[in-house]
Amino acid sequence: MTTHPTTAHTPKAAPLPRSRLRAHLVLAGFAAVGLAALTWAAFVQPLPRLIYNPSDSVPGGWYRVEPQRPGADSLSRPLSVGSVVLTTLPPEVAALAAQRGYLPAHVPLLKRVGAVAPQHVCIVAGQVRIDGVPMAAALPADRLGRPLPSWQLCRRLEAGELFLLSVTNPASFDSRYFGPVSASAVIGVAHPVWLETRP
């Protein structure tokens, strides 16, 4: 009996064109959705920022900043007393803050909103009063004995003005020394993410 050698053929998996096409379509769909989401986020709303605050003007820790539209005269949402904003200082105030080491040049700062329009703010004889209620002292000098600007004010805040006032640091450099700031200087509204516990 003659045996004929047989060659074992292992079947090779043939490419499945439909499966590949389907996978490519799904990937292309995800890519298109991702690109559309990025485009929408870039044009419709800026991405939130995460910043760290080491100072005592507001509680120290990490904050998420909801950006303000650039060049807007008023905030997209009205602010209330107690809101924390990331803002720039007027140029002459920023120069003084940098010169004295309160804040590096061109660095925005986090401050609490102490009063908004149409609240009445009065700074007389070293005392800050908001709607007639004493809120803070305006110190004559900083911790190193350097005289602080004596900013006298007794009027209602106008639309688009914010009076920044710390309640956590009596020596904070804020509106009691440089006056109200314009809402157009506000970069965004800060929301605490994680706050430090300090002794």
What are these regions (language model features)?
Residues 54-56, 113, 120-121, 154-155:
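Short, exposed beta-strand/loop patches in secreted or surface proteins that constitute
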Residues 104-137:
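Mid-length scaffold segments of soluble, non-membrane domains
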Residues 82-86, 121, 162-163:
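Generic structural signal for buried aliphatic residues
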Residues 124-195:
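Non-cytosolic head/periplasmic domains of membrane-anchored proteins
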Residues 68, 90, 118-120, 168:
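Short loop segments at secondary-structure junctions
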Residues 1-108, 156, 176-199:
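Protein maturation boundaries and topogenic segments
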